[in-house]
């Protein structure tokens, strides 16, 4: 029994199979033509090798279809429909079973060996890093854009091609792996991760994220302090120095109060800023 790797249905469904002339992979005629139409190229969904012809049928009923010129799929099915291919010897069956098993392995998605992750397309398994273009920010699955488009076409919802097939997230970003694009690449997920489209050390990523979170929190807190300062008409000659001094002192107290986090649900920053600014201005003016 032969199974189409795209729709996973077998030849008992009445669908005619076609064989790509370069790589030899077989698919239902409708499935492979729909795949090619939506993926914007003529590459095999399994091995990514481009084929220009699709071979249908055997012997005197054989038909070679030029994929670049297009064809009427119904006419091709009618042409080879009279041929019966029920007789297969044991050797052929064994080879087909092995091929199906191989295809199943290739279509499982990203290979994970303990903590070592292979950088490859999560749909077709291709490991040529130079051709991988998108990755999921949530689960780090990697894809060819053409594979995502093709799969969306096959499931009947073309608007979902920008959705990760592993975790269903819409957080797909551009992948930039040029430095290792000439070789099979892998990484240890305990120490490394894909971040902002690049392979990065996990420690450096966490440090960067922590720094950005603190910086954003401080900026938001400072906005409350500045609004409170703007309520006071300070003398022009002393305005700049007083503004900077009070802003720094009050902001630091609010940073420490919320442990360098911005927690507007727990703290009334406007009220705290007004109180802090008033207190610091009294101290500043007294010292002056």
From Swiss-Prot:
GO MF annotation list: ubiquitin protein ligase activity; ubiquitin-protein transferase activity; zinc ion binding
GO cellular component: cytoplasm; nucleus
Annotated function: Required for tolerance to alcohol.
Biological process annotations from GO: protein ubiquitination; response to ethanol; septin ring assembly
Organism from which the protein derives: Saccharomyces cerevisiae (strain ATCC 204508 / S288c) (Baker's yeast)
Pfam families the record matches: zf-RING_2 (PF13639)
InterPro entries: RING-type_E3_ligase_ATL, Znf_FYVE_PHD, Znf_RING, Znf_RING/FYVE/PHD
UniProt keyword annotations, A-Z: Cytoplasm, Metal-binding, Nucleus, Repeat, Zinc, Zinc-finger
Gene: ASR1
Protein name, per record: Alcohol-sensitive RING finger protein 1
Compartments it resides in: Cytoplasm; Nucleus
Zn finger region (RING-type): 4-48, 121-168
């Amino acid at each position: 029994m032969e199974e189409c790797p795209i729709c996973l249905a077998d030849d008992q469904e009445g669908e005619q199979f076609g064989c790509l002339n370069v790589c030899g992979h077989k698919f239902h005629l409708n499935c492979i033509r729909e795949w090619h139409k939506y993926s914007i190229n003529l590459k095999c969904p399994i091995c990514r090798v481009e084929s220009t012809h699709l071979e249908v049928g055997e012997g005197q009923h054989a038909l070679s279809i030029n994929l670049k010129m297009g064809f009427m799929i119904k006419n091709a099915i009618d042409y080879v429909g009279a041929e019966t291919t029920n007789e297969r010897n044991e050797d052929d069956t064994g080879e087909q079973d092995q091929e199906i098993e191989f295809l199943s392995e290739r279509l499982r998605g990203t290979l994970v060996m303990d903590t070592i992750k292979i950088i490859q397309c999560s749909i077709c398994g291709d490991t040529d890093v130079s051709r991988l273009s998108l990755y999921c920010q949530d689960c780090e699955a990697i894809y060819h854009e053409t594979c995502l488009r093709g799969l969306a076409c096959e499931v009947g919802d073309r608007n979902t091609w920008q959705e990760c097939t592993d975790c269903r997230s819409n957080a797909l970003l551009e992948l930039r792996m040029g430095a290792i694009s000439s070789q099979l690449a892998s990484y240890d997920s305990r120490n490394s991760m894909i971040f902002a489209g690049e392979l990065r050390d996990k420690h450096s990523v966490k440090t960067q994220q922590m720094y950005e979170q603190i910086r954003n929190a401080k900026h938001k807190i400072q906005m409350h302090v500045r609004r409170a300062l703007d309520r006071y008409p300070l003398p022009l000659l002393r305005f700049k120095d007083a503004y900077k001094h009070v802003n720094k002192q009050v902001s630091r107290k609010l940073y420490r109060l919320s442990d360098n986090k911005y927690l507007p649900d727990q703290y009334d920053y406007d009220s705290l800023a007004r109180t802090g600014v008033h207190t610091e201005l009294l101290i500043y003016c007294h010292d002056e």
